[in-house]
């Protein structure tokens, strides 16, 4: 079994990337503390960070943009989740130049162990045979009328072991 929370952001212009005060190899922050830093009512984990000795650091691995400004760039291509200046969700493999061309306002990225796209242009995708097992999950989507859907599923807990991609 699993449990999670779904946040519906009716105004996509309110969606933004929140970050630690400084990207360092020191310890990172938990989502709740980053949300407090921005007076946000909610948030989900995003991006990928350098793995420290005992915890993840506050140093992102790939592209991070906020308000159109590049805050971090590894110089390569990575899987990006972003929102454009006209509030459209963008998911794809790209570098900073492509993100700028697509008019991305805010984005985070992760390396290629991203999960599959579950729905594309309203059509459910075939995810049979995609590995990943039962784990904590975060998913993002956008409805046809522009609302942003943020789903966080708890995992590795007695009351919520996590979800598979098919569960999502």
Predicted feature locations:
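Extracellular/periplasmic catalytic domains that process cell-envelope and extracellular macromolecules
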Residues: 35-37, 74-75, 84, 131-134, ...
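A substrate-binding/cap region within the structured catalytic cores of diverse enzymes
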Residues: 74-127
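Short acidic/polar alpha-helix capping motifs at helix-coil junctions
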Residues: 12, 102, 133-136
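Short, solvent-exposed aromatic-acidic interface loops
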Residues: 21-27, 94-100, 153-157
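Solvent-exposed coil/turn segments that connect beta secondary-structure elements
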Residues: 12, 48-49, 86, 96, ...
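Domain-core and long-helix interface of multi-subunit machines
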Residues: 111-115, 119-168
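Zymogen propeptides
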Residues: 1-75, 79-80, 88-91
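A short, polar/proline- and glycine-enriched secondary-structure boundary/capping micro-motif
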Residues: 27-29, 100-106, 159-166
């Amino acid at each position: 079994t699993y449990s999670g929370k779904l946040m519906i952001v009716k105004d996509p212009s309110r969606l933004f990337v929140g970050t630690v005060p400084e990207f360092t190899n020191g310890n990172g922050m938990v989502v709740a503390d980053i949300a407090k830093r921005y007076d946000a009512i909610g948030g989900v984990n995003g991006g990928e960070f350098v793995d420290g000795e005992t915890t993840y650091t506050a140093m992102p691995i790939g592209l991070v943009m906020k308000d159109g400004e590049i805050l971090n760039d590894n110089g390569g291509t990575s899987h990006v989740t972003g929102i454009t200046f006209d509030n459209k969700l963008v998911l794809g493999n790209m570098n900073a130049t492509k993100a700028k061309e697509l008019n991305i306002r805010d984005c985070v990225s992760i390396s290629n162990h991203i999960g599959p796209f579950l729905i594309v242009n309203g059509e459910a995708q075939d995810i049979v045979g995609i590995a990943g097992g039962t784990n904590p999950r975060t998913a993002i989507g956008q409805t046809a009328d522009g609302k942003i859907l943020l789903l966080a599923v708890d995992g590795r807990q007695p009351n919520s072991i996590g979800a598979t991609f098919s569960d999502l």
